[in-house]
Each structure stands twice: as C-alpha cells, then as structure tokens.
C-alpha cells in the first residue's frame, strides 16, 4: 500500500492511499457490504452510480456463509462480487461480540455461537487473518478485544492487554505468511482499544505505533458513550498516532460525526447508517434528515434534496418515494440507498476540497448553518 499525506488544514488531512485495486483520497467513507453486497445495490451501482473506490465486507458473516473457502474459490471478494476496486474486511470480532449470545473472550481469542445455526466457533488472531487471506481483501483488520461502554477500569485494561497481545501475534503471523507468498498485496491495520480511558487509549496507541502496521484504526467507540466523549477520545489520541499512516474510525457514524472527527485528524470511516436509515425511510440531505413516510410528502413534487445530483434526485419526486415506501416496494430500498450513500460520499468529497483550500473551518460553519445549528 502506498500512503501519501498531501495536505493538512489544522488536524484535518487529505491523504492518498493506493492499494492493489484502487487509489482514493481521504477523508473517505466506505459503504458497508456486510455479506458481500451493500444492501439493495450491486457492483455496477457502487462503481457507476456512486463511484465508490473502497467498500467494506464483514469477516464474521462471510466466514459463516458462504464460508471463506467458497469466496476463495471465486477468486476472492473481487471475483465473487465483481466489485474490482478496494475491499476492507473487518476481523469479525465486533459481530462475534454483538450477535452471539454468551460469546466468551479468552487470551487465545473469542469463542462464539453462530447466529445462523448455533454452531460454535473460535476466532483467533491467526484464524481471522486466514479467512481474510481467502477473501484477498486489500485491507485486513486484526482481531481486537472490544468492550461495551460503560466498562470498569479493570475490564478496559484487560481489553487493551489482549488487543496488544493479539496485535503482536497478528503482525508476526502476517509477516511469516507473506514470506511464504501468502497475503502479498494485502495490508494489515491495527486497532486501538481502551474505551474512553485516556491512559489506556494512549498505552494501546503507543504500543501499536511500534508495530509495522500499514494503518491504525480506532475501535470501541460509538458503542454507548456520549458523542462529546467520543470526540474528546479521538482528539486526545491524535498526538500518539503516526502521521504517516492512515487513521480509521470504525463504525462511525452520523454526518456530524464525520465532520467532527475529520477535524480531529481521522481519514477513514464506515457505517451502516446510510443504508439502514434508507430502508427505514430516512433521507440525509444538505439541510438535515427527514423521514419520507410523513403524510406531508404524499403530493410533494420536489426531489429529496434540490442540491443533490444522485440518480434518485435526478429522476424521482418525494411524492413517488413516499408512495414506494408505503407500498413496501423493494425499488424504494435501492433508490433511498443510492441517495444516502451519494450524500455521504459527496460529504467526504466536499471535506477533501475544503481541506485542500484551507477552508475546513468555514466548511464546518456552513455545514451546521444549513442544519439550523
């Protein structure tokens, strides 16, 4: 992976990342294709309608079904999905933690029960990389020990100890596998844990900074803490993060979260919010968000957002979308998802432009002004 820090405006950064499958600028938002597809969309939508340069797939889900071996047989995620740009795969640890009842965390890994058939599995630092080698993802995430917030200081310390231990195991294993010709062209990111505890976050960041990861992620946020505490945690981490590696805030978040954390030096984001909210009838716009199911939109000839150039806003009215939603027409999911993802990707583009023009502060002021804040 090639990484270039191109420009800074305060702590906000524009970087260029090149993988084996695409080159993209940051700040970047990565649409989430949990099971190998962004819900209701296909590779053509992602490339030609949205021009997404990188998307995320989930190791937990793809490992359980169709299995990593099946994906490998199709030539990895790129051959399986026909999306020929970059893929980032998470380790599956979050889903093992959140979807599996009675998951157990040990120093060896995470034992969990499949939400599909109840079978038991063990994720270890090595096994999650083995699955991601099969996927041939461009960026692989290591296994980390996530805790729900609030958590006791003792549990947070255990989480950081395990995450550092697993990071060492993962980076050593990855280098050994590359020496054997496996994982060539695949990159590996470490994940910083520590809850909202300043000292534990710092300890984890400093430890992972010493390891030869291609990038560093901030995990374990947006899991119950107040937004202000998340922003403070990210800002406090900034001095301890290597400036010459990508910074990825996992699972975040709202448009406001993206703006606030870009201001604090974050480069990469992913979240299911644009597509999940789309399926529930909620649209993100330059002036805030609203739900299309309200009666006021039944005879509304206006498009979702007059300033938007997405496929949906170029072609369809609020009245039509209101009808599709109430009729439970599957077409609605695609049209709504196209709009919301276009909004997020365009937000990232506008932030890049503002940073390059040294006008991010003004951009942020206008962003909130349009929302009446």
From Swiss-Prot:
Looking up InterPro entries in the UniProt record yields:
TGT, TGT-like_sf, tRNA_ribo_trans-like
Chain residues that bind substrate: 90-94, 144, 193, 220
Q: Which residues bind Zn(2+)?
A: 308, 310, 313, 339
The cofactor note reads: Binds 1 zinc ion per subunit.
- Describe its partners and assembly state: Homodimer. Within each dimer, one monomer is responsible for RNA recognition and catalysis, while the other monomer binds to the replacement base PreQ1.
Q: Which PANTHER family match?
A: QUEUINE TRNA-RIBOSYLTRANSFERASE CATALYTIC SUBUNIT 1 (PTHR43530:SF1)
Q: What is this protein called?
A: Queuine tRNA-ribosyltransferase
């Amino acid at each position: 992976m090639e990484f270039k820090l191109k420009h800074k405006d305060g702590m906000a950064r524009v970087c260029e990342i090149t993988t084996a499958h695409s080159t993209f600028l940051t700040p970047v938002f990565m649409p989430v294709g949990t099971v190998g597809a962004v819900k209701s969309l296909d590779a053509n939508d992602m490339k030609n309608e949205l021009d997404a340069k990188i998307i995320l797939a989930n190791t937990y889900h793809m490992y359980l079904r169709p299995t990593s071996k099946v994906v490998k047989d199709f030539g990895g995620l790129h051959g399986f999905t026909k999306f020929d740009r970059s893929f980032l795969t998470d380790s599956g640890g979050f889903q093992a933690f959140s979807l599996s009842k009675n998951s157990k965390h040990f120093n060896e890994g995470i034992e969990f029960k499949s939400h599909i058939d109840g079978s038991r599995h063990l994720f270890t630092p090595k096994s999650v990389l083995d699955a991601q080698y099969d996927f041939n993802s461009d960026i692989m995430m290591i296994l980390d020990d996530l805790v729900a917030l609030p958590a006791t200081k003792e549990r947070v310390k255990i989480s950081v100890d395990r995450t550092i231990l697993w990071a060492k195991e993962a980076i050593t294993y990855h280098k050994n596998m590359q020496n054997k010709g496996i994982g060539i062209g695949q990159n590996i990111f470490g994940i910083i844990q520590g809850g909202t505890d300043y000292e534990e976050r710092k300890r984890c960041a400093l430890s992972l900074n010493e390891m030869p990861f291609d990038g560093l992620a901030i995990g374990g946020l947006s899991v119950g803490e107040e937004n202000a505490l998340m922003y403070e945690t990210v800002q406090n981490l900034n001095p301890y993060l290597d400036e010459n590696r990508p910074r990825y805030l996992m699972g975040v978040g709202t448009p406001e979260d993206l703006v606030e954390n870009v201001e604090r030096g974050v480069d990469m984001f992913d979240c299911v919010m644009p597509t999940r909210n789309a399926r529930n009838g909620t649209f993100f716009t330059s002036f805030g968000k609203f739900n299309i199911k309200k009666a006021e939109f039944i005879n509304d000839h206006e498009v979702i957002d007059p300033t938007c150039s997405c496929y949906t806003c170029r072609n369809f009215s609020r009245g039509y979308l209101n009808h599709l939603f109430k009729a439970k027409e599957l077409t609605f999911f695609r049209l709504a998802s196209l709009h919301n993802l276009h909004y997020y990707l365009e937000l990232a583009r506008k932030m890049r432009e503002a940073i390059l023009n040294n006008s991010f502060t003004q951009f942020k002021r206008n962003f909130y002004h349009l929302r009446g804040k």
